[in-house]
Curated annotation (Swiss-Prot):
<dbReference type="GO" id="GO:0002119">
    <property type="term" value="P:nematode larval development"/>
</dbReference>
<keyword id="KW-0808">Transferase</keyword>
<comment type="pathway">
    <text>Phospholipid metabolism; phosphatidylcholine biosynthesis; phosphocholine from phosphoethanolamine.</text>
</comment>
<keyword id="KW-0949">S-adenosyl-L-methionine</keyword>
<dbReference type="Pfam" id="PF13649">
    <property type="entry name" value="Methyltransf_25"/>
</dbReference>
<dbReference type="GO" id="GO:0000234">
    <property type="term" value="F:phosphoethanolamine N-methyltransferase activity"/>
</dbReference>
<keyword id="KW-0594">Phospholipid biosynthesis</keyword>
<protein>
    <recommendedName>
        <fullName>Phosphoethanolamine N-methyltransferase 1</fullName>
        <ecNumber>2.1.1.103</ecNumber>
    </recommendedName>
</protein>
<dbReference type="GO" id="GO:0008170">
    <property type="term" value="F:N-methyltransferase activity"/>
</dbReference>
<dbReference type="GO" id="GO:0005829">
    <property type="term" value="C:cytosol"/>
</dbReference>
<keyword id="KW-0443">Lipid metabolism</keyword>
<dbReference type="InterPro" id="IPR029063">
    <property type="entry name" value="SAM-dependent_MTases_sf"/>
</dbReference>
<comment type="function">
    <text>Catalyzes the first step in the synthesis of phosphocholine by converting phosphoethanolamine into phospho-monomethylethanolamine (N-methylethanolamine phosphate). Phosphocholine is a precursor for phosphatidylcholine, a major component in membranes and a precursor itself in the production of glycoconjugates secreted by parasitic nematodes to avoid host immune responses.</text>
</comment>
<keyword id="KW-0444">Lipid biosynthesis</keyword>
<dbReference type="GO" id="GO:0006656">
    <property type="term" value="P:phosphatidylcholine biosynthetic process"/>
</dbReference>
<dbReference type="GO" id="GO:0048609">
    <property type="term" value="P:multicellular organismal reproductive process"/>
</dbReference>
<dbReference type="InterPro" id="IPR041698">
    <property type="entry name" value="Methyltransf_25"/>
</dbReference>
Amino acid sequence: MSTDQQSSVEDQTVAMVNVRRANFKSFWDKYSDKPDTNSMMLNHSAEELESSDRADILASLPLLHNKDVVDIGAGIGRFTTVLAETARWVLSTDFIDSFIKKNQERNAHLGNINYQVGDAVGLKMESNSVDLVFTNWLMMYLSDEETVEFIFNCMRWLRSHGIVHLRESCSEPSTGRSKAKSMHDTANANPTHYRFSSLYINLLRAIRYRDVDNKLWRFNVQWSCSVPTYIKRSNNWRQVHWLAEKVPAEDGAKGTSFNELVELIKNTWQNEQEAWDAKLDDEKYVWTDKVFSSALTSLPSNSTFFLYTPRTVSPYCHINAHTLAETFNANVWNTEIIPEYYRTSLTKSNNLKDQRVRFGWNQSLTDSVTYWQQKDALFDVFVATEFLSTVDDETIRQLPNVMSDGAKFITLEPVDEVNEAEMKQRIQELGYTLKSFTDVTDQCIEAQEQYFKDHEQLRDEKVIRKNWVLLELTH
């Protein structure tokens, strides 16, 4: 490409970006004469859920004493106020002037806030200058290119071990499919990107940023989960937020380029998610249902269940959280570790609308246990697939810290050899007692065969012909 051609392409790209930002500015200018909570949340019923939603988000943040914070897309400052009450300093930014003026009015009593009117994409801050980058509904208003650029900027702005909080409407608006509640103008195009939740997880995990000192950094994504208020008030599991920490990159890591990440989020990850949606969204039942049924018959109603489904051996080897909730009138938390399967679980929840069932994503069971320890949670029953084969010994020993006294542990394990004595010894070394050991190999193979027959889109999938054992443990 010649210099003139390259210059022409760059000029066209800049022009396209400027048009896009103008469209978004026009989109929000329609609400600028009403700088209130309804406008911030584009929801006629926002006042009913605002305080609860805000409490959910703030409860997920780390302690901010002596910390510096930037609140990007702050609007009228519904989060800025609380952030500034505990943080050392807050920069509150938005690209609608009337919103920032309202923000300044409501926070005039606080002297540790700076305000800036401007686009999030063009925000200028010093490197290593803040401890928390806080956003709430931002990247859905950015193009794929702008989203990647913004995540690079977050990495640059954050100090070592700084935190970024992101929250987005995934796959659909915050109002779900309700046109009555939405303030979106149906007569005009809505420029919002309702991306898959998995795309954000993958982007945060993939980025490797090299700073001016040639040091390489990555994000440790601590968790992803739905915002509880939107489940309770709107039956919407697709209001998702994430917390990620800036940490040194692993040894041997290489930096990721802007173009590489744009291609991944625009095409590769999108296509991969759509392929898994086609296979899993219409799942009628889970093949493990019958296998687990005998071990679960003695469990009391109104229990709290902690599920772990790594799906390492097969995407179809997981636990039917909705069946457990229905059978035992139980509250169920299911930890997924594959972003694409997590997204399909949220879809199923949105369709079935059983508020007793919640799904979270963590990189490992270790992170999930840490998440619940921080919340002082206790569960009555732990049900898993591949628990002993995918979890490190230290985490297995730590798991009882989030389980109640007398809790039951049930796991379906693929094994090379059915050896009860060997399994019993290992379990004892981990601090557990083996109460029941059942060879369910034939049952698992038959269940998989029937499952694939019953799902037309899965007819070509392979049965996992390993040995399988069902274990019941106590601690």
